[in-house]
Regions:
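Conserved alpha-helix/loop element of class I SAM-dependent methyltransferases that forms part
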Residues: 35-53
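A short glycine-rich, Lys/Arg-flanked "PGG" loop and its adjoining helix->strand segment in the class I
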Residues: 134-149
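Class I SAM-dependent methyltransferase SAM/SAH-binding core
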Residues: 56-107
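C-terminal helical/coil "lid" or tail adjacent to the Rossmann-like core of SAM-dependent
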Residues: 194-242
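Short alpha-helix
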Residues: 170-185
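A conserved beta-strand element that flanks and buttresses the S-adenosyl-L-methionine
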Residues: 119
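N-terminal, positively charged/glycine-rich alpha-helical extensions of SAM-dependent methyltransferases
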Residues: 1-26
Length: 257
């Protein structure tokens, strides 16, 4: 990742975990879902992935581990986290104690058919280009058992040129993404757009706001948090203008034979 994304997913992740740890356990999951882990999105994916208690679920680009912890609490899956940034790995281990491997999504260090299911939330656009995005999808297919499912949250370019996109992001079009999915030997079985994400419950919102207030009280003057806030603002503006769209997709790995 380049500088702006490293600030958000490494340094700020580490700081966010410190804040959540000081505020208490009820803040851990909302704080660690900072970014793409909205409850409505996670609930939709869990409904369509149909995980069962005890199944192994790989979270690729897991960040601080909030979505994986949410899934484990709701469904009883056993999460395995894969995350490239050391600060986010430390945050996930500190808050949830889940197994986490520092690794790139284009070269997952797991054997073929290791897990029952996986998800990858808002990560595809952080790859440095189309070849890396195809590699990520290929790795997801490789590590999931035949007949298993993969959940994606993806941000897609709805226009040829984006106005002032966040640095380091590469947004495929919907057509490009679905071509990549087919080339990886995967099948999209469920697709939905999230133009207007349902507002989280009030207690969730309150905890997120408390974490943000304390994060900015402690670190608001730092260049790392300023950069992360700027990246988030650019992202939000593109979504609001319709230049970017959010999709949730469930993919199926073909059954053996």
């Amino acid at each position: 990742m380049d500088g702006p994304m490293e600030a958000e997913f490494d340094t700020v992740a580490d700081w966010t975990a410190r804040v959540a740890a000081d505020l208490g356990p009820e803040y851990y999951i909302p704080a660690a879902c900072r970014g793409s882990g909205q409850p409505a999105i996670l609930d939709w994916l869990l409904e369509h992935l149909e995980p069962r208690p005890g199944e192994l679920m790989i979270d690729v680009g897991a960040g601080m581990g909030g979505p994986a912890a949410y899934a484990a609490r709701r469904t009883g899956v056993q999460p395995l986290l894969a995350e490239p940034e050391p600060g986010a790995c430390r945050a996930a281990a500190r808050l949830f104690g889940a197994p986490v491997v520092q690794t790139d999504a284009t070269a997952l260090p797991f054997g073929p058919a290791t897990a029952d299911l996986a998800w990858c939330l808002g990560v595809l656009c952080t790859a440095p280009g189309s070849a890396a995005q195809r590699a990520m999808l290929g790795q997801l297919r490789r590590v999931i058992r035949p007949g298993g499912r993969i959940g994606l949250l993806v941000y897609l370019a709805a226009t040829v040129e984006l106005d002032d996109p966040p640095q380091g992001n590469h947004f495929p079009s919907s057509g490009q993404l679905h071509d990549f999915i087919g080339l990886a030997g995967l099948e999209a079985v469920e697709v939905a757009g999230f133009h207007d994400v349902v507002q989280p419950p009030p207690d969730w919102v309150g905890r997120v706001e408390a974490v943000e207030r304390e994060l900015h009280r402690r670190y608001g003057q730092t260049p790392e948090l300023t950069t992360a806030d700027q990246q988030s603002s650019l992202f939000g503006r593109l979504l609001s203008s319709g230049q970017l769209i959010a999709q949730v997709i469930v993919l199926r790995v073909a059954a053996a034979g």
